[in-house]
């Protein structure tokens, strides 16, 4: 089970890191077309049982189908390329490494959300990575800007982690980027 979940999440991390930077060399329209194509490829691969690494999971999930949907939503709602990048990096890094570390190191300390097992290690991993991503974006805007907007560095990672926890069956792949985009869109990012 560990090998399958870790392999699946490594694909999640790798693809997400690549996709996060699409706006810097593709148009929004091209990104949206790629998301629809990505969705269709995953749907067909489920039916034909190809790409076993992303489908090899014992629990019920629609995460692999909702991953491109979350990216599509981010592309539709993000006010800037940076907002899109940070939202998708939450899927790739925060969610991906939370699952990897939670699977490997989180067996001893866990809790349940809607009868789904979540690990303390995974949630802390998500929070730390989210804090670093949001903190970096806010700091990039300048020190006076960062001081004025420190609230988002504190609250947005907590809200995103909450959404990751309640987003069962893979719905976190839509909820997390939606919350991150909404939170960062409230800021006037350069």
Task: Please place each PLM-identified region on the residue numbering.
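Interhelical loop and helix-boundary elements at the membrane-water interface
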Residues: 1-31, 43-190
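N-terminal, motif-rich segments that launch catalysis or mediate targeting to/interaction with membranes
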Residues: 32-39
């Amino acid at each position: 089970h560990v090998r399958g979940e870790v392999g699946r999440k490594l694909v999640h991390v790798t693809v997400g890191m690549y996709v996060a930077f699409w706006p810097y060399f593709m148009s929004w329209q091209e990104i949206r077309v790629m998301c629809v194509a990505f969705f269709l490829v995953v749907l067909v691969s489920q039916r034909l049982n190809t790409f076993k690494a992303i489908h090899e999971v014992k629990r019920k999930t629609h995460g692999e189908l909702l991953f491109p949907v979350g990216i599509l939503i981010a592309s539709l709602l993000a006010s800037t390329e940076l907002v899109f990048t940070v939202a998708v990096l939450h899927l790739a890094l925060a969610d991906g490494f939370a699952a990897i570390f939670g699977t490997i190191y989180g067996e001893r300390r866990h809790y349940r959300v809607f009868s789904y097992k979540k690990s303390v290690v995974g949630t802390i991993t998500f929070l730390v990575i989210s804090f670093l991503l949001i903190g970096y974006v806010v700091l990039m805007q300048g020190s006076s800007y960062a001081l004025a907007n420190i609230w988002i560095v504190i609250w947005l990672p907590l809200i995103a982690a909450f959404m990751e926890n309640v987003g069962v069956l893979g719905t976190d792949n839509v909820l997390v980027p939606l919350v991150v985009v909404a939170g960062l869109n409230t800021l006037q990012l350069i």
